A protein has these predicted regions:
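Non-catalytic regulatory/interaction regions at protein termini and inter-domain linkers
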Residues: 1-35
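Intrinsic low-complexity, intrinsically disordered segments enriched in polar/basic residues
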Residues: 2-5, 26, 39-42, 81-85, ...
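N-terminal membrane insertion elements
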Residues: 2-5, 9-13, 135, 140-176
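Generic hydrophobic, helix-prone segments enriched in Leu/Val/Ile
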Residues: 29-39, 117-122
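N-terminal membrane topogenic signal
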Residues: 36-48
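Hydrophobic transmembrane alpha-helices and their membrane-interface boundaries in multi-pass
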Residues: 47-137, 156-161
Length: 176
């Protein structure tokens, strides 16, 4: 009986280590945490800058291309969010680690929300690829994927599936 309890504790400890400290021991993770934060900050600054310019380009293109005119408001909102996140990464996040982590998660949620609105609400059958691509790309930009980030993605997947199933039953809706 003692051996089973110890085995479960060891397994639980390994799971916690994997999700909380990226598979390392707590002290090993603590030694490289500053470097990870700097690399994540650099990557998220680049990613939010590219995202802001991409959404600005899509917003401008929506005046020229009739097929994306219905998403103009979404592009504008996501451009504003991406621009504000870019500014936050370049200013506030440089000096305040907690603020930088919060902004990182806010940016992740905003991108996944954009994918949900575009994919699940606007047309669940045709544009689900946007949400899936964002689910794949966002973790590739980070050096460590902690438990909170995994929980955000799991929650957004559940929200996406529920909304997609409901809008599929009700028919498509338009946000414009």
């Amino acid at each position: 009986m003692k051996r089973e309890k110890r085995t479960y504790r060891e397994m639980w400890g390994k799971m916690i280590s994997f999700f909380m400290y990226d598979g390392m021991k707590k002290d090993e993770y603590a030694t490289i945490q500053g470097e990870i934060y700097e690399k994540n900050l650099r990557n998220m600054t680049i990613y939010s800058s590219v995202s802001a310019f991409l959404f600005l380009g899509l917003y401008i293109s929506s005046y020229l291309i009739d097929s994306i005119i219905g998403n103009r408001f979404l592009y504008l909102i996501q451009f504003i969010v991406s621009f504000l996140v870019m500014c936050a990464f370049r200013t506030i996040a440089q000096n305040h680690r907690a603020a930088g982590e919060s902004v990182k998660y806010i940016f992740e949620v905003s991108l996944l929300s954009f994918g949900i609105v575009l994919g699940a609400i606007k047309s669940p059958e045709a544009e689900a690829a946007v949400f899936i691509v964002l689910l794949v790309i966002i973790p590739m930009m980070l050096y460590d994927v902690l438990l909170f980030s995994v929980l955000i993605r799991a929650t957004m997947i559940i929200v996406y599936v529920v909304i997609a199933l409901q809008t599929k039953d009700m028919g498509y809706c338009s946000l414009t």
